[in-house]
Amino acid sequence: MNIWIKKITENKIFCLLLTLNILLVVFFLFAPQFAPNSPIEIHADHALLDSSGQYPLGTDQLGRCFLSRLLYGGKSSLLMTIGIVVFISLAGTTVGIMAALAGGAAEQIFMRFLDVVLAIPSMVLVLVMVSIFGNGIVTTTIAIMSVSWITYARISHSLVLEFRESNFIKQAHMGGVGSVRILFKYVLPNVFPHIIVVATQDFGDKLLLLSSLSLLGLGAQPPTPEWGYMLSEGKQFMQRAPWLLFYPGFLIFIHVIMFNLLGDRLQDILDPKET
């Protein structure tokens, strides 16, 4: 663990990417404090206005300040994505570790269940759940969580099995070291770095999935500002007001690219072949 931390802190490119990602997230979490106007207040006579002093990025089809909606939408999108990734990584990792430690028939049954679920595209499962329980950001978030934790369970289970059969774990058992101490001293420090890599790379995927569902009208509902739903609202005004598509699409693109780059760089640093 100390070796990995040292390699991370010595990698200037990773530190730069990490700083930029943190600044992006923090900015949009607090950006609504600087919104020039209400994101939901309708002014029909100001519909689809170009940029001006009152509306720095123009207005949407209902005369709402588009900059304010972008800022509030960023907070909504990022908070939901962070919540999803934190939940599925913790829940999936916990379940995977417990399954690996349990062993026996229960482990085999559980892993076969994961294999069956993983064989079905997650987008299909999410769409089925949303069609059953209805549209809405809460339903969509729960649906994504319900199918996404399985990946983390599978990864953590495989990692624990690998370490469980390693020589130093067997020697620790022979030396009288308890299972709980082995778990916290040897297993978890080797599992969590890999989970962090997956979670970092998964952030962009979940943001894109959440935005895609909102674009289809299955996620955020009016008047809630959210980047994916803003794309859905703006697509019919692509010729008249292209900014309604450009700005939210660009922000989604930037966040996905930045977190993917961060995750790829972190994976290179923590690659066991290099340690």
Predicted regions mapped to residue ranges:
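Transmembrane alpha-helix signature in integral membrane proteins
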Residues: 66-101
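Glycine-rich helix-loop "coupling/hinge" segments at transmembrane-helix boundaries
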Residues: 130-132, 144, 160, 208-251
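Hydrophobic alpha-helical transmembrane segments of membrane transport/permease proteins
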Residues: 27-62, 216-224
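Short helix-to-coil transition segments within interhelical loops
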Residues: 59-64, 101-102, 171-190, 231
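Membrane-cytosol interface at the C-terminal ends of specific transmembrane alpha-helices
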Residues: 85, 93, 97, 135-185, ...
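Generic hydrophobic transmembrane alpha-helix motif, especially the helices
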Residues: 56, 60, 92, 100-106, ...
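C-terminal transmembrane helix and the adjacent membrane-cytosol boundary/short C-terminal tail
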Residues: 146-147, 193-203, 242-275
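N-terminal signal-anchor/first transmembrane alpha helix
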Residues: 1-37, 113, 191
